[in-house]
Curated annotation (Swiss-Prot):
Family annotation (SUPFAM superfamilies): Homeodomain-like
Compartment list: Nucleus
Region annotation (Disordered) ranges: 1-35
Biased composition (Low complexity): 16-27
Function recorded in the entry: Transcription factor which may be involved in developmental processes.
Protein family membership: Belongs to the WUS homeobox family.
UniProt DNA-binding region: 29-93
PROSITE patterns: HOMEOBOX_2
Pfam families for this protein: Homeodomain
Nucleus found in the keyword field: yes
Main location: nucleus
Source organism: Arabidopsis thaliana
Descriptive protein name: WUSCHEL-related homeobox 11
GO biological process: adventitious root development
């Protein structure tokens, strides 16, 4: 009975990552400290972007054989790389969704602020309770005219009093209107400071790309490869196509926002 139960004991570990096709255990310790080379990363990223995000065991073995041309690698290394790559992809997707939601919230807040500032009432002097200014002006003018001899008749005094009253009301109305306009513009600029700044990066032509898996901001248009990355490196798209440069070392085509690229040594 003991001999019949012994072969079934290893089945509890059936969920472990695939082992190397050679069957040797010497290649397995590499997976814990494996650092893929740029050529290996290029192959893995190309396969991942082609839609194969969770390759089966047979494909894992085939991918491992392709990667072995550039360095030591085991099946477990390939298995864990795709596992980590899926996690990074999901995390990046969540970050992009959160950034889009924050941008929408900022836009809605600014729209509401503009509506509130535009709906602020513009009161004249009489609406704010300063209608007594006309009475004061009439009284001062009447007192002044009587003190200096009262040489004018009642009709001329009435005309001058009306003129002073209208002038005072117009001056106060203009000052009040100017105050509310300044207040509205200040509220809008304080609560919505990012309207102009949010477009600054786009106007400058800055885009974000992933170089060797790291988000990097670059300028839109031709990039000086020699000054930026050195003379011994070539920029390759995740599809495996190298990016051409002109005789001065500038990229002939602009990088695409959100795309993945890799720096690989120049083949001599």
């Amino acid at each position: 009975m003991d001999q019949e139960q012994t072969p079934h004991s290893p089945t509890r570990h059936s969920r472990s990552p695939p082992s190397s096709a050679s069957g040797s255990t010497s290649a397995e310790p590499v997976r814990s400290r494996w650092s893929p080379k740029p050529e290996q990363i290029l192959i893995l990223e190309s396969i991942f972007h082609s839609g194969m995000v969770n390759p089966p065991k047979e494909e894992t073995v085939r991918i491992r054989k392709m990667l072995e041309k550039f360095g030591a690698v085991g099946d477990a290394n390939v298995f864990y790389w795709f596992q980590n790559r899926r996690s990074r992809s999901r995390r990046r997707q969540r970050q992009l969704q959160a950034a889009a939601a924050a941008a929408d919230a900022t836009t809605n807040t600014c729209d509401q602020t503009m509506m509130v500032s535009n709906s602020l009432p513009h009161h004249s002097g009489s609406d704010l309770g300063f209608g007594g200014c006309s009475t004061s002006s009439n009284y001062l003018f009447a007192s002044s005219s009587s003190s200096y001899g009262g040489g004018c008749d009642n009709q001329s005094n009435s005309g001058m009093e009306n003129l002073l009253t209208m002038s005072g009301q117009m001056s106060y109305h203009e000052a009040t209107h100017h105050h509310y306009q300044n207040h509205s513009s200040n509220v809008t600029s304080i609560l919505c400071p990012s309207d102009q700044n949010s477009n600054f990066q786009y106007q400058q032509g800055a885009i974000t790309v992933f170089i060797n898996g790291v988000p990097t901001e670059v300028t839109r248009g031709g990039i000086d490869m020699k000054a930026t990355f050195g003379e011994d490196l070539v920029l390759v798209h995740s599809s495996g196509v190298p990016l051409p440069t002109d005789e001065f070392g500038f990229l002939m085509h602009s990088l695409q926002h959100g795309e993945a690229y890799f720096l690989v040594p120049r083949q001599t």
